[in-house]
Amino acid sequence: MSWLRTSPLRQSLTRSGSSSGNGSSGTATTMRQRPIDAATDCDPRACYDSFCKHWQQAHEIIQHPGTPTHDDVLGVVSHLDYMVTLLLVELHHCNKVSLPSADAAPPAAPCLEYLLSENLLDKLYEWASSTGRYANAVRLEQLKLYELLVSHSRHQLLCHEPFLRPLLKILASSQGEIFPPDLEKRLVILLNQLCVVLMQNVHLLDLFFFSAQTQVQEQIQNGSLPAPKSGTTTNFIIFSLLIPYVHREGSLGHQARDALLLCMALSQKNSNIGHYIAQYSSICPLLVTGLGGLYSRLPNSIEINSIDWHRITPDDVTEIPELTLFMNALEFCNAVVQVAHEMIKQQLLDFMYQGFIVPVLGPAILQTNIDSQISAMSYLDLILRSITEPGLMRAFVKFLLDTEKFDGERILDALVERLHSPDANLCMVTMALFDTLLGLHCEDLMLELLLKYMLPGKHVPISHRHKINKIDPYLNTTEFFLELTPDVMKRARDLARPKSVQELVDPAATATTTATAPSMLLSLPSPVMSKTIGANWNYYGHYTGDSLYANVQAYLFEAHSRIAQCQRDCRKWANSYRYQKWPRQGQARATAHALELARQFFSEFGTAAPVVAAPVASEAGEKQLDSLQSIGESSGYESFKWRPADEDAEGIDVTTTTTASASDTDLEHNNNSSSISSGRRDSWRISHSSRNEILLTDLDFSEDLFAQGTVSLGPFLNAIWSKLQTFTSNSLYVNLHLTGLITRLAWYPLPLIHSLLLRSDIAITSDTPSFHQVLRMLKQQIDAELPVAENSLEIIDVARSYLIDREFRLVNARKITDNSPLHQQLQHQQQHQQLAQTNSHTQQQQQQQQQQAQQRSTYATLSAATPVQASPTSAYDPFRRSDNKRRSISRSITSMFSRRSTSSTPASNGNSASSGLSQIYAFFTGAASTLVGGSGGEGSGARGAAQDSTRGNTCETSLSTAPRQEPQTNVGSSSNSSIGSSTQTLSGTHSSSTLHGVESGLQTGNFNSEPVSLDSVASMGIIANTSGTERSRDLALCAVLLDEWLKELAAVALEQSVVLVTEQLL
């Protein structure tokens, strides 16, 4: 994808003297094709005589008066070819490594000395300027000659003026010229080699730089060198010649960008070059405008061919030529910011922000079309994942948080709003973008998204705020998350567990382990997954082909590495973001304000002042104080903040502790008595054994005591929690991104985030249900709609096998394109299965009955079974979204009480004769299909026709939140949930996955035509024989996913507690 990764720039810096570099390796000329045998002994005198003879013949042609003819040019080029060959032989022998000796003289190079002493290159340039229409051909041979000499002689020739002066002349005359492609290639190669030589010999940089300034000006004044078309003389002519080729495609652009990067790196070593590039060159505006132009060529709408697509991959970049050019330009800008001089870096960042990020990316992201939003956010996600320079990253973060450029609307707020989008693709792309943003570990982003809403601590009751910064090492949060596992998954795990635990653990320690830590058994891989869990996981990033399902050790290792990386990045932040309590000392004005609020509070309630004014410890006083203390425990307003007993050592101001009096007279009366003051302090501490102590300095009276439960955690967390509440209605892929995003938040080793996500002992009072409350609701919903039954366990097993199969496909399979043979094979299999499904429905029913009977007998020995493993080319999809097994309650009730037409069939007439109450009862017990949809035989026989006739129906809002489905006869595994729970949990928005399947069917006109991806390989052979409605299959998939996610959260909580307790002890 990147030109920089495959660029010869990495190898160019370590070239040896005998190597020819980029240019010489690509030279396809006659002089390079001639074999030069290094082992052949050449007579230096003979070589020198031949060299001089060829130059004499070429010089005679050059001296001819008049315009050179075609034969003259060919003659000079031919003699020049022989001269270059002799020079190569001489330089090759001069560069040989030989053992030093006392009488050894430096190797002689008579041909090169003759070339320099007679100014042959200068004479050749003067003649080439008068060749007319053959000027480009002669210039091409000159560039080849300079290229070979620079690559073979390294830096020695640059020190000689007879070589440097004609080289600068030919380079200066090339400014502003338009050359043919072969000449441009030679010029860029020569410039690249010069940059490599200067990079390796920095001491020549000033000589070359100032020579370009003085000598060219002298030649222009003397008339021997034409003035450049730009009208000004450049100081660093190599850099100015490379600028026009920065956005070229192919190898020419690669060579030019390599050379420009070397020039940028040279600016770090020479401030004159950095000042020239920043002040007098147009490289920064050119890079930014070119980047904006390349972005405008990107597709405004990305064609999505898979239901799980959420971001642009390197394969996508390779397949889209416009995206490849844009990424090349972006990575070049990133490299320039990394290696260039500080002046150049700052100028480029300013131009990037003002010329590309704000005017180009901003309007693109704020578009209203969903397809345009998906493409723009995908490009932004790709940009953020590609750039590595912190300065450039800060520019994009500033762009997300800027409130002045877009009429007061922040880009970050617009992105948060899109988390509520009902479009599954837009929601997944948005969550993938936020996953990238959270992975940056940026302090500013985390402050705006989360921390600024959590720092005041108002979302935590006052009695629990002291726990935020203190981690209890004995708090077992792991058990809390594991207890939230749905009951059906617990039952499936019990059935999958072997009868004798001693086979997996030490027999001597089995009893104690089971009694003390029953949750430890969950870390043991279940035998059902014995052939698929990561037994060969080596923790070095090598995937051995085994599944990571139920592998808690892998979760622990992943959590440990992620938390450690996040901790290293967060240590660089400017603030620690720990909860700060109300200050006890100083700030007299704030203390006086707190006193006034306290007086107003006690004067309103009127009962607290007499109680605390008298320093007595009577039983009545104790009861009153206990009743006052109970306000913080029992009332819903959390009036007081409790202070733990371990804070007794902290100093307390006496005057601060005597502020419990409710009137000024009581305060003045007791000011002169220290004993009464101490007695008052003791009156607040009736029992020293009490765990919590009340101190008015810990009371934040500025808070509204009756505003508990209205504190917002911010739009980002509210959007995440609202999406999590619809967990059972979301598509699988949305839930995968949602759980991954929350897990990434849990990796942050910050006490505030840890208390919000991983602390079960801290209550949260906000305007939305807390994270733990949402998890409890999901457990209750799944338990109610998917009870522990034989059919539910069967669907759970199929869902688990589907997820494992998906894991194998994602890891081992390559991307399936529309034109690939595998995709064509899958389409052929799907068409064949559609035909076979309508012709062999009776056989499928028989096989289903046999499998159910066999599974009843084998469920007791489920631990010895191996889950179904479908190959990537199989047609197994246990959750085919197009299955018509769900009904709308509105249509069912309408069909119950509506008057049937006289032309209805006998079957329909018979169904209409059924009572309405029986049909309602049958609907909620899963048998409505047999009452409303006709007899069993007719319903079974008409399954394919019913699917074809209803695939064009639109989706309606109903209790089931799904498209209207035709009646089915299979009701064996329907959920027996109550009406209340169904109404509460199923009245939300439509399921994204279900709607997506319907939309795809409408567009293509094919019932089974879902967008093809690794996860849409329809495996219908097994799921067709699995009983249960589509809702039950969706719930089973959610249950398996929730079970695995809870294990991951338990592992994160365990590792996070270790990290925070360690920091607390240090």
UniProtKB/Swiss-Prot annotation:
Residues 12-30, 655-678, 822-855, 890-913, 972-997 have a biased composition (Low complexity). It comes from the Eukaryota. Signal peptide: none annotated. The modification Phosphoserine is found at S500, S820. Residues 1-11, 856-874, 947-971 have a biased composition (Polar residues). The keyword Phosphoprotein applies. Keywords: Phosphoprotein. Residues 1-35, 651-682, 821-913, 935-1007 are annotated as: Disordered. Disulfide bonds: none annotated. The keyword Nucleotide-binding does not apply. PANTHER family: FHIP FAMILY PROTEIN CG3558 (PTHR21705:SF11), RAI16 PROTEIN-RELATED (PTHR21705). Belongs to the FHIP family. This is FHIP family protein GI14169. It comes from Drosophila mojavensis (Fruit fly).
